[in-house]
Amino acid sequence: MKNLKWVAGVALAVGLAALPVLAQEAAKKEPPKPAPGPSVAVLEQWNEIGKKLIAIAEDLPEDKYDYKPNPDSRTFRAVLIHVSASMYFFTDPAQKQKPRYTDDPKPADLKINNKADLVAFVKKCVQDGADVIKAKGDKGMSESVNAGGPTLIRISDLAYALNEHSGEHYGNLVVYYRNNGMVPPESRPKK
């Protein structure tokens, strides 16, 4: 019995002594992967905010489309149209075209008559921008274009500006959701 306790004690001591070594081995990781190229980094951000806007467009109950927090604010529908249409302030100049919308288009001008039309419009705007970023690649994203400002702007900088603009309006939509007692899709528990 005494030998058994001694053997068990030694085994326990060896096991405990080995834990730090095992933990260090587990902590050793693969070296970090190289940073993504500029176009990949822009595309990841573009798609991330686009995914959030699409999720809201798909999730938002149609009876809330005309909600606005105060009379001077845009409605849910107007914010989604504004943020989506504004993506062409990147997409069009990046292709050396004039932006197709000089101001916020009206739902009737876009033939947006219902939720399905609005969801399709948001998806198209996001996809068109993603397609331009992919087509431009790293070299093309470093080209400069005339986007209507006082100086030329690098295409990647224009994309980052639109990503930021989209994120700001996503924040507006989150507040609209919360004001209506709803939880935005991105804030819900993951299943």
Language model features: what each stretch is:
Residues 9-20:
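Bacterial N-terminal signal peptides
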Residues 21-25:
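Boundary at the C-terminal end of the N-terminal hydrophobic targeting segment
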Residues 43-47, 54, 64-106, 146-191:
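Short, contiguous alpha-helical
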Residues 45, 110-146, 154-168:
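Acidic/histidine-rich alpha-helical segments that form the ligand environment
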Residues 52, 56-57, 91, 128, ...:
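Well-ordered alpha-helical scaffold segments within catalytic/enzyme domains
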